[in-house]
Amino acid sequence: MKKTLMLSLLCANLFGFAENLNTFSAHFVQTVEDEKKSVIKYSGDIKAKRPNMAMWNYVAPVKKEIYIKDEDLVIIEPEIEQVILKKVGNTIAFFEMLKNAKKVDNDTYKAKYEKLNITIHLKNNKIDSITYLDELENHVKIQFTNQLENQKIDDKVFKAKIPADYDVVTQ
């Protein structure tokens, strides 16, 4: 859960360092490798929009939807028919941190969020991947494909549709 939250907060503000980027959508593959070299891969799609909205649609290995709008986080887990509602606090400082990410070279930026050192890789001037070592010392890589930037995304995309028969947990 903590990894999912960190990933969501990271990418809700992913494009903050790119001054002219207002929306971002892409397919992603997230690879998490632990110290024993065990690897778990997740895949799905992301849509994100300034100032602080994101929707992650995980399709494999399990279905999960994560919505962030301002300070509200909603996680919908169809396999267990559960919804988690959580306040994530103000992420503006994080947004500013990415906006001020340090350029390493033409295709690499370094950023810091709390205790995470994040590397943002660009390819053809688009966000290609993000890598970081999480709080459990897992190597995390989020690889993006089919990236679209500055396309119109309706704000309705970021409103979770909570099934009436799901259990709702407020944290």
Name what the model sees in each region:
Residues 39-41, 104-107, 111-117, 122-171:
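Non-transmembrane domains of secretory- and envelope-associated proteins
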Residues 30, 58-62, 70-72, 79, ...:
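A mature extracytoplasmic/lumenal domain signature
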Residues 45-93:
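An acidic-aromatic
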Residues 20-37, 47:
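A short, Trp-centered hydrophobic/proline-enriched beta-strand micro-motif
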Residues 16-18:
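Boundary at the C-terminal end of the N-terminal hydrophobic targeting segment
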Residues 4-13:
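Sec-dependent N-terminal signal peptides
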Residues 78-115:
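Flexible, surface-exposed loop/linker segments and immediately adjacent secondary-structure boundaries
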